[in-house]
């Protein structure tokens, strides 16, 4: 799993501030989000398991997490699938591909930049 890159988003204890931590040793901070990227590090990345705890959605925490992912991988060709966050991913250059009327899942891609 050396090409699997986990990202944890933690709510900093006592501040309400979201931050990315590299370690699973969060101490008193509360994990409120998670994402995993599979990549070859050269041409392609696949975004999967992007989750923000429901009560923290719509407050900018997903943006914090996605900004970090795109900072590290945004120059690569990207792929993902989603059911309900199409507009969110479009802000990062992803676009729907295929016939989105025939499936619940929306497959999206982002060209290399």
Regions found by a protein language model. Name each.
Residues 75-110:
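Conserved active-site alpha-helix within GNAT-family acetyltransferase domains
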Residues 55-65:
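Conserved acetyl-CoA pyrophosphate-binding loop and the N-cap/start of the following alpha-helix
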Residues 40-42, 55, 85:
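Short coil/turn motifs at secondary-structure junctions
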């Amino acid at each position: 799993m050396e090409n699997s890159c986990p990202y944890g988003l933690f709510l900093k204890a006592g501040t309400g501030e979201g931050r990315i931590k590299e370690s699973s040793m969060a101490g008193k901070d509360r994990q409120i989000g998670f994402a995993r990227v599979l990549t070859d590090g050269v041409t392609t990345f696949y975004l999967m398991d992007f989750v923000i705890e429901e009560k923290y959605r719509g407050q900018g925490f997903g943006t914090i997490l996605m900004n970090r992912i795109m900072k590290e991988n945004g120059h690569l060709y990207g792929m993902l699938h989603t059911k309900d966050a199409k507009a969110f991913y479009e802000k990062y250059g992803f676009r729907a591909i295929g016939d989105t009327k025939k499936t619940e899942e929306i497959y999206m891609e982002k060209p290399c930049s």
